[in-house]
C-alpha cells in the first residue's frame, strides 16, 4: 500500500 511517502505494498 504505497502512500505519499513509501509504505508498500
Curated annotation (Swiss-Prot):
Disulfide bonds join 2-8. The keyword Disulfide bond applies. Its main location: secreted. Keywords: Disulfide bond, Secreted, Toxin. It comes from the Eukaryota. One of its GO terms (molecular function) is toxin activity. GO terms for cellular component: extracellular region. The keyword Iron-sulfur does not apply. The cysteine framework is C-C. This is Conopeptide-pc. It comes from Conus pictus. The lineage of its organism: Eukaryota, Metazoa, Spiralia, Lophotrochozoa, Mollusca.
Amino acid at each position: 500500500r504505497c502512500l505519499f511517502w513509501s509504505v508498500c505494498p
